[in-house]
Structures are given as structure tokens and as C-alpha cells.
Swiss-Prot record:
Pfam families: MerR_1 (PF13411). Residues 8-27 bind DNA. InterPro entries: DNA-bd_dom_put_sf (IPR009061), MerR-type_HTH_dom (IPR000551), MerR_fam (IPR047057). This is Uncharacterized HTH-type transcriptional regulator slr0701. One of its GO terms (molecular function) is DNA binding. GO terms for biological process: positive regulation of DNA-templated transcription. Residues 4-73 form the HTH merR-type domain. Keywords: DNA-binding, Transcription, Transcription regulation. It comes from Synechocystis sp. (strain ATCC 27184 / PCC 6803 / Kazusa). SMART domains: HTH_MERR.
């Protein structure tokens, strides 16, 4: 007999908020789970595997739309290794671009911090600091 878990049991097991499960269902990322005799949602092992995949894919930076697309292709048995290769390559390029943007932001902040340190060492510890306004305009 397969396991049947409630929303709270699944949420606890996967470290998710129960509302997240309802949200995934509402937007169509996952199918509606079965209901028990009392009308409560119950999840089987296959549902748990899908929800675990979603959580892991989100941790890797995939959007819910991208995840839904992957799950749809998989359910149609048309998810090829080539398709996954292209999705992973695209995701890596997006991440690399984001890393470059963050490195530039860090460099910009470091420059402002350096100016701040100079002003502090020149006795500018007190009073209104307008350094951010000067640097951000």
C-alpha cells in the first residue's frame, strides 16, 4: 500500500509552508492531489517526489514557470537529455550574468565605503552624511 500524507505532513517533511502546496496546485505547477473520505488532500510518494523536485529546482534558481515546463515535458514523456542540457546551460548563463552584476554592485559599494572611511578619518564622524546622495546621483 502506498503512503498517504496530509498537507501538514508533506510540508513538514519537505520543509515547506502548507500554503506553498496550495499555491503550486492553484497555479498548475502540480496536479490536484487525491482527497480522502473527509475531503482532505492526501499525497502519495509520486506527489512527494514531484514536490521534492520542485523544491530542489527552486534552490537551483529555476522559476516556477521553468519548473512547470520541465514537469509538463516529463509528463508527456518528451523531456530529452538535449532539452535538459539546453535548460541547464541557459540557467548557468543567467547565473553568471547575475554574478557579474553583483560583483559590479559590490565594487561600487566598496568605492563608496572607501570614501566613507576617508571622511571618518578626516573627522567626519558626526553630522549629516550625504555621501550616499553624492555617489548615487
Amino acid at each position: 500500500m502506498s503512503i498517504m500524507l496530509t498537507v501538514s505532513e508533506v510540508a513538514r517533511k519537505l520543509g515547506l509552508n502548507p500554503q506553498t502546496l496550495y499555491f503550486y496546485e492553484r497555479i498548475g505547477v502540480v496536479d490536484h492531489p487525491q482527497r480522502n473520505q473527509s475531503g482532505y488532500r492526501v499525497y502519495q510518494e509520486k506527489d512527494l517526489a514531484i514536490l521534492s523536485f520542485i523544491r530542489h529546482a527552486k534552490d537551483l534558481g529555476f522559476s516556477l514557470e521553468e519548473i512547470a515546463d520541465i514537469l509538463h515535458l516529463q509528463s508527456q514523456q518528451s523531456l530529452t537529455c538535449d532539452e535538459i542540457y539546453h535548460k541547464l546551460t541557459s540557467k548557468i548563463l543567467q547565473l553568471e550574468s547575475g554574478i557579474k552584476e553583483m560583483e559590479k554592485m559590490k565594487d561600487d559599494l566598496s568605492k563608496i565605503l572607501s570614501l566613507c572611511c576617508q571622511r571618518i578619518s578626516n573627522g567626519g564622524k558626526h553630522g549629516n552624511c550625504c555621501l550616499l546622495n553624492e555617489q548615487l546621483t
